[in-house]
Amino acid sequence: MSKLKIDFPAVVYPDFTLIAGVDEVGRGPLVGDVVTACVILDANNPISGLADSKKLSEKKLALLFDEIQEKALFVAVGRASPVEIDALNILHATMLAMQRAVDNLSISPEFVFIDGNRCPQLSMPCESVVKGDARVAEISAASIIAKVTRDREMCELDKQYPHYGFAKHKGYPTKAHFAAIEKHGVTPEYRKSFKPVKKVLGLL
């Protein structure tokens, strides 16, 4: 049976100059921060090849990450920690991280496109865009910044805790990851409200 393809209407850009895109990476992992990015692109300095970060190779991601940092007008990152995720839940922690990414920009955008189906509370108008990382260039750029940032942090965590395979699975739940936490337990960076982690901690 073929997969039903949904055609989304074209995204209409508002009549503003400073338009930002925001996306998140890391809602599903068992460990580490949820990381968000906010990007304002330069219309006079276009970047080709922007796409949903999940569909790009590691090499292409790294190249685009550098190009976005070089060519975009403004780039900022936000995050919410495992402690905040456990206290707020992953949805509210993600909204908080998105707010922080916008707040961390060195200039206030006039309008913000948010990936997904809801907007965080912001001081400027915003619009949520389903599948925005494939439909809005600013969101695509933000998804690349967020993903490369988080992936590199997981590679650093892998050096600290080499038995968990963080560099490979980036903290997401995999068979190898489950086996590692069953054998070695959890580190302080784990999200203790997530069911597989609760199970290891004997909280279920």
Swiss-Prot record:
<feature type="binding site">
    <location>
        <position position="24"/>
    </location>
    <ligand>
        <name>a divalent metal cation</name>
    </ligand>
</feature>
<dbReference type="InterPro" id="IPR001352">
    <property type="entry name" value="RNase_HII/HIII"/>
</dbReference>
<protein>
    <recommendedName>
        <fullName>Ribonuclease HII</fullName>
        <ecNumber>3.1.26.4</ecNumber>
    </recommendedName>
</protein>
<dbReference type="GO" id="GO:0043137">
    <property type="term" value="P:DNA replication, removal of RNA primer"/>
</dbReference>
<dbReference type="InterPro" id="IPR012337">
    <property type="entry name" value="RNaseH-like_sf"/>
</dbReference>
<dbReference type="Pfam" id="PF01351">
    <property type="entry name" value="RNase_HII"/>
</dbReference>
<keyword id="KW-0540">Nuclease</keyword>
<dbReference type="GO" id="GO:0003723">
    <property type="term" value="F:RNA binding"/>
</dbReference>
<comment type="similarity">
    <text>Belongs to the RNase HII family.</text>
</comment>
<keyword id="KW-0963">Cytoplasm</keyword>
<dbReference type="GO" id="GO:0006298">
    <property type="term" value="P:mismatch repair"/>
</dbReference>
<feature type="binding site">
    <location>
        <position position="115"/>
    </location>
    <ligand>
        <name>a divalent metal cation</name>
    </ligand>
</feature>
<dbReference type="InterPro" id="IPR024567">
    <property type="entry name" value="RNase_HII/HIII_dom"/>
</dbReference>
<dbReference type="InterPro" id="IPR022898">
    <property type="entry name" value="RNase_HII"/>
</dbReference>
<dbReference type="GO" id="GO:0004523">
    <property type="term" value="F:RNA-DNA hybrid ribonuclease activity"/>
</dbReference>
<keyword id="KW-0464">Manganese</keyword>
<feature type="binding site">
    <location>
        <position position="23"/>
    </location>
    <ligand>
        <name>a divalent metal cation</name>
    </ligand>
</feature>
<keyword id="KW-0479">Metal-binding</keyword>
<dbReference type="GO" id="GO:0005737">
    <property type="term" value="C:cytoplasm"/>
</dbReference>
<dbReference type="InterPro" id="IPR036397">
    <property type="entry name" value="RNaseH_sf"/>
</dbReference>
<dbReference type="GO" id="GO:0032299">
    <property type="term" value="C:ribonuclease H2 complex"/>
</dbReference>
<dbReference type="GO" id="GO:0030145">
    <property type="term" value="F:manganese ion binding"/>
</dbReference>
<keyword id="KW-0255">Endonuclease</keyword>
<keyword id="KW-0378">Hydrolase</keyword>
<comment type="function">
    <text>Endonuclease that specifically degrades the RNA of RNA-DNA hybrids.</text>
</comment>
<feature type="domain" description="RNase H type-2">
    <location>
        <begin position="17"/>
        <end position="204"/>
    </location>
</feature>
